Amino acid sequence: MTLSNFTDTSFQDFVSAEQVDDKSAMALINRAEDFKAGQTVHFPEPIYAANLFFENSTRTHTSFEMAERKLGLTVIPFDPAHSSVSKGETLEDTIKTIGAIGVNIAVMRHAQDGYYNDLLGAWPTTAIVNAGDGAGQHPSQMMLDLMTIHEEFGHFDGLSIGIVGDLSHSRVARSDMQMLHKLGATLHFAGPEQWYDSSFDQYGDFITVPELVKQVDVLMLLRVQLERFNADHRQAFSKETYHAKYGITDDLAKTMKPGAIFMHPAPVNRDVELASDLVDGPQSRIFTQMQNGVFMRMAMLEAVINARHFGEE
């Protein structure tokens, strides 16, 4: 399946893992690999994008902007702190405003889970691309993770994948586990029990960190998200205690399978989720994920552009 085979409605907006099936996942991976190999695309008419990030971001924000510029899109600057949202304007009215002035694609991140549900169709000629909603979904991180795993192993079916850490607060974990389960991977979870959601049982089992580390092909660490905790949770662990009990130490890493890899959505808390030297070690694919993120976001944006017929004469 290629991107040109997508139906017009498949990716008119790109907001959640539920939109992606196994065929479209592989089509996006293949297209991202094309871009990584140097393929380019040209749109006959101008396309305008705005990046509306209401939460702090380094990787996702700059990665989307790089993807937009590589595709030849015109990026319209948007600063939430100096926007009318700070004066009380609703997100829906913000989308209507940028749509009215001609923005085709709004890439958005917001702390509210499912914020995009009220924005889909707010302006008929403006597409919504979700760059992360609270603890809900993170489809572009999901897709770049899939690309990185496929690049390493060439398949998903039968792979053993472990996700460790702050599971209940992680939009990355939610998106990744849904898609990896669809693709036939075996999933294992580990971390503090109070940070685990029983709804994840449908995707895999919850085991100890040492048990998980020795049996997985992909070890995905999650950032400890202090900004989403209440005061009591912040005091649950010191960095040193967390690293010793739930982090990947140098000694624990020695028990990994040959050929197994580390992944992390970043930013990494060095010597908390993962020993600092392992972040830059030969088993780490953390910076490969960042590289792949640009090409995958190019593929995702192109899918939206094709579905909407943007840029056509």
Swiss-Prot record:
InterPro entries: Asp/Orn_carbamoyltranf_P-bd, Asp/Orn_carbamoylTrfase, Asp/Orn_carbamoylTrfase_sf, Asp_carbamoyltransf, Asp_carbamoyltransf_Asp/Orn-bd. Carbamoyl phosphate binds at R59, T60, R109, H138, Q141, A266, P267. It is an enzyme of class 2 (transferase). Keywords: Pyrimidine biosynthesis, Transferase. Its EC number is 2.1.3.2. It catalyses: carbamoyl phosphate + L-aspartate = N-carbamoyl-L-aspartate + phosphate + H(+). GO terms for molecular function: amino acid binding; aspartate carbamoyltransferase activity. L-aspartate binds at K87, R171, R223. Gene3D superfamilies: Aspartate/ornithine carbamoyltransferase. Pathway: Pyrimidine metabolism; UMP biosynthesis via de novo pathway; (S)-dihydroorotate from bicarbonate: step 2/3. The keyword NAD does not apply. GO terms for cellular component: cytosol. Heterododecamer (2C3:3R2) of six catalytic PyrB chains organized as two trimers (C3), and six regulatory PyrI chains organized as three dimers (R2). HAMAP family: Asp_carb_tr. NCBIfam families: asp_carb_tr, PRK00856.1. This is Aspartate carbamoyltransferase catalytic subunit.
